UniProtKB/Swiss-Prot annotation:
<dbReference type="InterPro" id="IPR035649">
    <property type="entry name" value="EFG_V"/>
</dbReference>
<dbReference type="GO" id="GO:0003746">
    <property type="term" value="F:translation elongation factor activity"/>
</dbReference>
<keyword id="KW-0342">GTP-binding</keyword>
<dbReference type="GO" id="GO:0032790">
    <property type="term" value="P:ribosome disassembly"/>
</dbReference>
<dbReference type="Pfam" id="PF03764">
    <property type="entry name" value="EFG_IV"/>
</dbReference>
<dbReference type="InterPro" id="IPR020568">
    <property type="entry name" value="Ribosomal_Su5_D2-typ_SF"/>
</dbReference>
<feature type="domain" description="tr-type G">
    <location>
        <begin position="5"/>
        <end position="281"/>
    </location>
</feature>
<keyword id="KW-0251">Elongation factor</keyword>
<dbReference type="InterPro" id="IPR004540">
    <property type="entry name" value="Transl_elong_EFG/EF2"/>
</dbReference>
<comment type="function">
    <text>Catalyzes the GTP-dependent ribosomal translocation step during translation elongation. During this step, the ribosome changes from the pre-translocational (PRE) to the post-translocational (POST) state as the newly formed A-site-bound peptidyl-tRNA and P-site-bound deacylated tRNA move to the P and E sites, respectively. Catalyzes the coordinated movement of the two tRNA molecules, the mRNA and conformational changes in the ribosome.</text>
</comment>
<dbReference type="InterPro" id="IPR031157">
    <property type="entry name" value="G_TR_CS"/>
</dbReference>
<dbReference type="InterPro" id="IPR000795">
    <property type="entry name" value="T_Tr_GTP-bd_dom"/>
</dbReference>
<keyword id="KW-0963">Cytoplasm</keyword>
<dbReference type="GO" id="GO:0003924">
    <property type="term" value="F:GTPase activity"/>
</dbReference>
<dbReference type="InterPro" id="IPR004161">
    <property type="entry name" value="EFTu-like_2"/>
</dbReference>
<dbReference type="GO" id="GO:0005525">
    <property type="term" value="F:GTP binding"/>
</dbReference>
<dbReference type="GO" id="GO:0097216">
    <property type="term" value="F:guanosine tetraphosphate binding"/>
</dbReference>
């Protein structure tokens, strides 16, 4: 199939346990991809194919699947809902044209729903809304619609209404066609009847149809005027065209309801994917960037098979078949045997086997074109975010930017023979997940794993043990503290070394002060005359910048420091670049304490759900953890508490929360910002670091 208007690249995303993976399973059943529907409760779903996913009933990696509906090709990505795996959602949104946001009918707009929604807004991804689990106790479709409006600040365009609720939920009313779809209790998606709207819903259905038409027609002024002034109702085709335009422009979000688990309402969502979500040619084309500056060049990757190749590697995965590179093709074609250029490395790669993925199963293909999401087997030097292009037309697509890890653990193999095996395994895992980092402690020789949260690292350790057979000793989690300064000072430092023959000499006079939050390290020279020759300024900058990696208080990286070199001294024979670099390093060590060096700790944005009768206990516990409560929202099933809490106070929190709430509490957290440590905490952290270093 080469008609790009019949392509839909979509993602399914939501909060943990809202029913994304179950919804994907139902879609695959309806489109004929699978014949027996899997169930997350027993770990048999198609897209959750890792052992860790099947056991925990959560989606960790974004599984890609291709299927067909009404003569349209759907490339679907099922994304994780847990906040520790938000990187997968971000990575998927980067290559999608549309999406389905799944919300739990009883839980409503939950913490990760907000995060995913924010990312989708930033990526300008058109979305449908599916309010799922309306067969559940406490489900309330209209409450969730209100939350979408009030919490997310989005405009839901209600397309279906529930017939019955909780155990009485039997089907939906199609607001536009004014027909009822009623399923029997067999659980089979095809066992439904199209009926007249129940008598007690006729008025409500008519009211929602009027709202739908008025909202949709805001996209076409002529139709709106004819409707309001002359009472002329537009055709269904015109209404659908307006809905499609408004959906593409994020003016509103077509909203559907149902129960994926009970197979009710899914066909209408698939119809909506085809009717309202954009094809690859209808979204803004990907901008091209300057590889040196990262700035947009003003050129774009035109979505056409006739253009030179422009493709983005958005995911690396190592499975039982070997290394897979997932690729979104934006322009041109890619064929088996082609040679492509990796613009990030300047090296060429030969395209070997190309496959379409159905979760962890592969179907080999010979070629792909603009609009396709495929995987290539065995690419050697490609990483996430790299651009693959025609060697004769080099270009760079907008890169992916990933958050820094906030938590780390030390690991070592239980037996000596495991070191090499662990090194190979970790290398593959880092390639797969850019938010997972590794480094070696130079003094202790320990391997340090860094990630986005406890669950993130817990899963990584589990993969090392189970998938790669590496038995590990795992240290306690460590917080990624940072250091900074609080005062501006003026200082001078001289480096002088004489040991026969030519020596070393460098003198620098400098000002050091706190930089703006998020500025990192900035350096400038205002030296006039030749007291510090211009060719040595980069060496001074390099010396200071190198010391930013290890602060003076406890060896943590230093943030937001501004250095100005304004004068100094020079010796015609003994001065050199290395002498000035050493001087800058000594200056950093000398001046940081004088400039009020301060320890910073990561603060997490924490979102807790608790039954109402445990609110006091939960807030009291968060206060004891040095938390600052920002917001409290009462819902029908409990209370959501939002606040900022230091990461160091959140280890093991889920166990405490479950105990306090008799197992009914839930929480999520994501990094918010760095904040100064209280003195007593800073003193303890510094003492702990010194003690650990003494043991090395």
């Amino acid at each position: 199939m080469t008609d790009l208007s019949k392509y839909r690249n979509i993602g399914i995303f939501a909060h943990v346990d809202a029913g994304k993976t179950t919804s994907t399973e139902r879609i695959l059943k309806l489109t004929g991809k699978i014949h027996k529907i899997g169930d997350t409760h027993d770990g048999s779903t198609t897209t959750d194919f890792m052992e860790q996913e099947a056991e925990r009933g959560i989606t960790i990696q974004s599984a890609a699947t291709t299927c067909f509906w009404n003569d349209h090709r759907l490339n679907i990505i099922d994304t994780p809902g847990h906040v520790d795996f938000t990187i997968e959602v971000y990575r998927s949104l980067k290559v999608l044209d549309g999406g389905i946001g799944v919300f739990c009918g009883s839980g409503g707009v939950e913490p990760q729903s907000e995060t995913n929604w924010r990312y989708a807004d930033e990526s300008h991804v058109s979305r449908l809304i599916f309010v799922n689990k309306l067969d559940r106790m406490g489900a309330d479709f209209y409450k969730v619609v209100d939350q979408v409006q009030n919490v997310l600040g989005a405009t839901p365009l209600v397309m279906t209404l529930p017939i019955g609720i909780e155990e009485d939920f039997v089907g939906v009313v199609d607001v536009l066609s004014q027909q009822a779809y009623v399923w029997d209790e067999s659980g089979q998606p095809e066992n439904y009847e199209v009926q007249e709207i129940p008598a007690d819903m006729v008025d409500k259905a008519a009211e929602y149809r009027e709202m739908l038409i008025e909202t949709a027609l805001e996209q076409d002024e002529d139709l709106m005027m004819a409707y309001l002034e002359e009472g002329e109702e537009p055709s269904v085709e015109d209404i659908k065209r307006c809905i499609r335009k408004g959906t593409r422009d994020l003016a509103f979000f077509p909203t559907y309801c149902g129960s994926a688990y009970k197979n009710k309402g899914m066909q209408l969502i698939l119809d909506a994917v085809v009717d309202y979500l954009p094809s690859p040619t209808e979204v803004d084309p990907q901008p091209l960037t300057d590889p040196d500056t990262g700035e947009a060049t003003g050129e774009v990757a035109t979505v056409s098979a006739d253009e030179p190749l422009k493709a983005l590697a958005f995911k690396i995965m190592d499975d039982r078949f070997g290394a897979l590179t997932f690729i979104r093709i934006y322009s041109g074609k890619m064929k088996k045997g082609d040679t492509v250029l990796n613009s990030a490395t300047g090296k060429t790669e030969r395209i070997g086997r190309m496959v379409e993925m159905h979760a962890d199963e592969r179907n080999e293909i010979d070629s792909a074109q603009a609009g396709d999401i495929i995987a290539v087997v065995g690419m050697k030097n490609v990483q996430t975010g790299h651009t693959l292009c025609d060697p004769k037309h080099e270009c760079t697509l907008e890169p992916m930017i990933f958050p820094e890890p906030v938590i780390s653990i030390a690991v070592k193999p239980k037996d000596k023979g495991g070191s090499e095996k662990m090194g190979i395994a970790i290398g593959k895992m880092v390639a797969e997940d850019p938010s997972f980092q590794v480094e070696t402690d130079e003094e202790s020789g320990e391997t340090i794993l860094k990630g986005m949260g406890e669950l993130h690292l817990d899963i990584k350790v589990d993969i090392l043990k189970r998938t790669y057979g590496v038995e590990l000793e795992v240290g306690a989690p460590q917080v990624a503290y940072r250091e900074t300064i609080t005062q501006a000072i003026e200082d001078s430092y001289t480096h002088k070394k004489q040991s026969g023959g030519s020596g070393q000499f460098a003198k620098i006079d400098y000002r050091i002060k706190p930089g703006e939050v998020g500025s990192g390290f900035t350096f400038k020279s205002t030296v006039v005359g030749g007291n510090v020759p211009k060719e040595f300024w980069p060496a001074v900058e390099k010396g200071f910048a190198g010391m930013m990696e290890t602060g003076v208080l406890a060896g943590f990286p230093t943030l937001d420091v501004e250095v100005e070199l304004y004068d100094g001294g020079f010796h015609a024979v003994d001065s050199s670049a290395i002498a000035y670099e050493i001087a800058a390093k000594g200056a950093f060590r000398q001046s940081m304490p004088k400039a009020g060096a301060q320890l910073l700790e990561p603060i997490m944005k924490v979102d807790v759900f608790t039954p109402e009768d445990h609110v006091g206990d939960v807030i009291g516990d968060l206060n004891r953890r040095r938390g600052m409560i920002k917001d409290q929202q009462a819902g029908t099933t409990g209370v959501r508490i939002k606040g900022d809490v230091p990461l160091s106070e959140m280890f093991g929190y889920i166990g405490t929360l479950r105990t306090m709430t008799s197992g009914r509490g839930q929480f999520s957290m994501e990094f918010s910002h760095y904040s100064p440590c209280p003195n007593n905490v800073a003193e303890q952290v510094i003492a702990d670091v010194k003690e650990r270093n003494a043991k090395k």
